[in-house]
Design a protein with these regions (language model features):
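N-terminal cap/leader regions of alpha/beta-hydrolase-fold enzymes
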Residues: 1-244
Length: 244
């Protein structure tokens, strides 16, 4: 596991490389449940398409990968909810200013990996990681692809709401929202689409019918295989269009 020095400590990170050993870079923002084997599996799948994937522990201020790892059985609704009570506050600790600073460090680290070929990069985020991905794309003109799946909190009334970053983005965007998600309602998705249109950005912005929040995570009770396959097929197409 790679270690990334930051202004506030050290973030551990997974690096997954393609069969060729080199390729365009993709920054992977984990969900609220931490940098665990499921995240490594997903990063490896993206890498198998021909990309170098960097997945940092974005909660490094709260502890190491081991410190913030899931406790209990996430595959039951009760276990998932119990760990959410532990993991949820960490999201609040990672405010917009900290996220912006971290993102710049992560993108610099990604580009400096010897396996990463010169050129545009992509970002992808899950759950609250989608917020980080949008912020990264809004601040870095060389981010050519940005995807977010079962995102939460992309559209708020706050001045630092992630969707306000879209005005300065250059990327193509892909969003696969969860269905019946209180953290990303149909009204939120509509407002996100309006912000994408106002910025003149190419985008796919969809609600995946019947897919719960967390649907990509096979180690949790929210797993929905059909929605995951749809999300990753769309992600594969996005990266192929924008990074090659």
């Amino acid at each position: 596991m790679l270690t990334i020095p930051t202004a506030d400590g050290v973030a551990e990170a997974i690096v997954a490389t393609p069969p060729s050993g080199h390729g365009p870079g993709v920054l992977f923002f984990m969900d609220a449940f931490g940098l665990r084997p499921r995240i490594a599996e997903m990063a490896a799948e993206i890498a198998s398409w021909g990309y170098v994937v960097l997945a940092p522990n974005v909660f490094y201020r709260d502890g190491s990968v081991a410190d913030v790892a899931p406790r209990g059985d996430l595959s039951t609704p009760e276990g998932r909810e119990a760990f959410w009570q532990v993991a949820g506050p960490r999201i609040g600790h990672l405010n917009a200013d900290l996220a912006v600073a971290d993102n710049a460090t992560y993108l610099e680290t990604l580009r400096e990996l010897p396996e990463v070929t010169p050129g545009p990069v992509g970002v992808v985020g899950f759950c609250m990681g989608a917020r980080l991905a949008v912020r990264a794309a809004g601040r870095d003109p060389d981010v050519a692809a940005c995807a977010g799946f079962h995102a939460g909190g992309l559209v708020t009334e706050a001045q630092d709401s992630p969707h306000r970053e879209l005005a300065t983005a250059r990327a193509e965007f892909l969003f696969g929202h969860a269905d019946n998600d209180g953290s990303m309602t149909p009204e939120n998705a509509k407002a996100l689409g309006e912000a994408l249109d106002a910025a003149g950005l190419a985008a796919t912005n969809e609600i995946y019918e019947g897919a719960p929040h967390g649907y990509t995570m096979s180690d949790t009770a929210a797993w929905n295989e059909a929605a995951f396959l749809r999300a990753f097929a769309n992600l594969k197409d996005l990266l192929a269009r924008t990074l090659h």
